[in-house]
Structure formats: C-alpha cells, structure tokens
Amino acid sequence: NVADVLATLQARDRAGNLVLAETHQRVLSVLRMAEALSQRYAVVVANPPYMGGKGMNARLSSWAKENYPNSKSDLFAMFMERNLDLAVKGGAVAMITMQSWMFLSSFEALRSRILNQHPILSMAPLGARAFDSIGGEVVSTTAFVLENAHKPDYRGAYMRLVNGNSEAEKMEMMAKAIAQGMAA
C-alpha cells in the first residue's frame, strides 16, 4: 500500500544523515506521485464472475492463495476483497454475489474482515431465481452495500427477498420493503 509506505517514511527524519537525506527526499517524492496516481473510488459496483477453487488452473489457484488468502475459495470473493481495497476511506462497495460467503467455513476470514472493518449498510438475500436468465435453483445470491470505514456499532438495513420466484417478484418485494421502512 503506497499510502502506508509513504506515511512510514515521512515519519522518519533523515535530515541528520547526509548520505540518506537526499535519497530519502527523492523516495518520498516518487511515493507522493505514486499515491496521486493510485486509483481509488468513492463507489465500486460489481456483479463478479463465479469460479470455485476446483475450476481454477494451477497458476490462478496459486496466485489466489498468495494474494487473497481470505477469499481464495472463489473468484467472486476475491473481487469482494479487491473492491474493498479499491474504495476510498468512507466509500461504498455494492455487489451481488453468491451467498455462500455468509455461511461456508472457507469464507470465515473474509466474513471476519467484513464484520470487523466494513459495516454492512444494507443487504438483501435474494435466494435462487434472482435472475430470470439463470433458471431454477442454480445459484442463491445476495445483494449488499458495504462501507470502507470502521463503525463497530453501525446497524444496517436488511431485506429478506428469498421467497419471490422471478426478478419481477423480488423487485416488487424490495419496493414494498423500502416503502415500509425496510421491514421485509
């Protein structure tokens, strides 16, 4: 993280060391440029691809284990973590994903990160049939918005929309829940 390295180096005073002082200032200058060029977003929105660990080739699996140990079990979960990293402090991440991350033990570390560091602003478990283009009981999904901030006592808004049998029914249920103050 460029910002963390920059903060660490800025905290170190090298003015008294003639050998390091000039190099230290050059490194700080480069890090300031890198920080300015690092893309961060106020809002990150995604419906990520799904690919379980068994579907990954050896190279992708190895990369996932090294770079996303908390979410390596599925590509969608890696997108969750990456999107949280792309959001600015106080920014939002809105996604629709498989709901397996909420229940399976392989996602326990991811859940812990979310629950301890990123308040759930809103969540709507959609269950199966959230997309008419995916027929039947193929995948159970959840839509959610997380904030990239630490608010341990924040209470989000939740709507349970698993009973609808089509996109239209779920949209109608959501509109009704919102109109009634999110009491679905």
Tell what function each PLM region has.
Residues 58-67, 105-118, 138-143, 159-165:
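Short secondary-structure boundary/capping segments
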